[in-house]
Regions:
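Bacterial N-terminal signal peptides that target proteins for export
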Residues: 1-7
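C-terminal motif of bacterial Sec signal peptides marking the signal peptidase cleavage site
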Residues: 17-18
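Glycan-recognition patch characteristic of GH18 chitinases/ENGases
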Residues: 27-126, 203-209, 215, 300
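Substrate-binding surface in catalytic domains of secreted glycosidases
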Residues: 36, 65-76, 120, 139-262
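Glycine-enriched alpha-helix->loop->beta-strand junction motifs that scaffold or abut catalytic
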Residues: 52-54, 185-191, 283-285
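Conserved, mostly hydrophobic/aromatic
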Residues: 56, 94, 136, 192, ...
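Helix C-cap/helix->beta junction micro-motif
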Residues: 88, 129, 161-164, 283
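Substrate-binding cleft of secreted/luminal carbohydrate-active enzymes
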Residues: 233-306, 310
Length: 311
């Protein structure tokens, strides 16, 4: 059913593709279809078209087991992101954690005093950099006490953030493997980024994985308006950016597979991303991208493909 809906929407969108021009001047935050892009300190900001986004997640702010935050290494870059994004009405969130920081979250979330320290540090950071909220990327809470601590942490952070601030989180693609995510979390956050990639060593993010991911989270109780479908701007197994793949062979890079230094790499090309946008328009509320510095430049940008398909 998901596949049928996605393809039908894609065909309808194709008929209108020729009418798509410059980015919509409508304020990004008021557009109903979310386009969430992760940005890292490695990004060259001048080549990213922020007007094609609704939200930017700046990655990463790192936690300590004590509940304190590690020294932030790119303050100038983040301030520049906020300046550029806010000029086009794009929201900016700080993403806290990321892969490999599970032990820190487990420890800090397990005690009320450490949670309070973490919450205050994040709220102060949001205020200092004039951010629009926080994205908590705990990969991943386990079932039982860990899950309960995650709920407590998110509830306390939500209560401490200023009114109108955004609070989001990221989850694994398959909800049946996410026992540590209590559905009560859905009542606390604004939306959830579903990381529908890294599903295998090779063809790691096909359309079928996206369909299965959204269906599984729907079954767990995550509402359509809170589901944001994650897509990769990189290939597996080599973790090669789409930009490098495109520069190596522009014609072949339009597909989903390419030989890169004699080794097959699998990724999402323009056609697959259009199909995923069509799927997200039916079964979710937007697209999330990991990550923007991996995109091709100018007219060959995958962000451009996503933005045009979303119109």
């Amino acid at each position: 059913m998901l596949f049928t809906k996605a393809i039908s929407a894609l065909l309808c969108g194709a008929l209108l593709a020729g009418c798509t021009g410059a980015p919509n001047k409508q304020p990004a935050a008021s557009r109903s279809f979310r386009i969430v892009g992760y940005v890292t300190a490695a990004a060259v900001l001048d080549v990213i078209d922020f007007s094609r986004l609704t939200h930017v997640n700046y990655a990463f702010l790192l936690p300590k087991k004590s509940g304190e935050l590690k020294t932030f290494g790119s303050p100038t870059q983040l301030r520049r992101v906020v300046e550029i994004a806010h000029a086009t009405n794009v929201k900016v969130l700080i993403s806290v954690g990321g892969w490999g920081w599970d032990d820190e979250f487990e420890e800090l979330a397990a005690a009320e005093d450490r949670r309070a320290r973490f919450v205050r540090a994040v709220v102060d950071f949001v205020a200092e950099y004039q951010l629009d909220g926080a994205d908590i990327d705990w990969e991943y809470p386990d079932a039982g006490a860990s899950s309960e601590h995650f709920v407590a942490l998110m509830r306390e952070l939500r209560a401490a953030l200023p009114a109108g601030s955004l609070l989001t989180t990221a989850v694994v693609s398959d909800a049946t493997h996410a026992d540590g995510i209590d559905p009560v979390i859905f009542e606390i956050v604004d939306f959830v980024n579903v990381m529908a990639y890294d599903g295998g060593p090779a063809n790691h993010s096909p359309l079928s994985l996206a369909e299965q991911a959204l269906s599984s989270w729907d079954a767990k109780g995550l509402r359509k308006e809170q589901r944001v479908l994650g897509v990769p701007f990189y290939a597996r197994p080599g973790d090669i950016s789409y930009r490098k793949l495109f520069e190596s062979d522009p014609a072949t890079a339009d597909g989903d597979r390419i030989l890169y230094f004699s080794k097959e790499q699998n990724y999402n090309g323009p056609a697959t991303l259009r199909a995923k946008v069509a799927l997200a328009k039916e079964e979710a509320s937007g697209i999330m991208i990991w990550e923007l510095s991996q995109d091709a430049l100018g007219a060959d940008s995958l962000l451009k493909v996503i933005w045009e398909a979303s119109q």
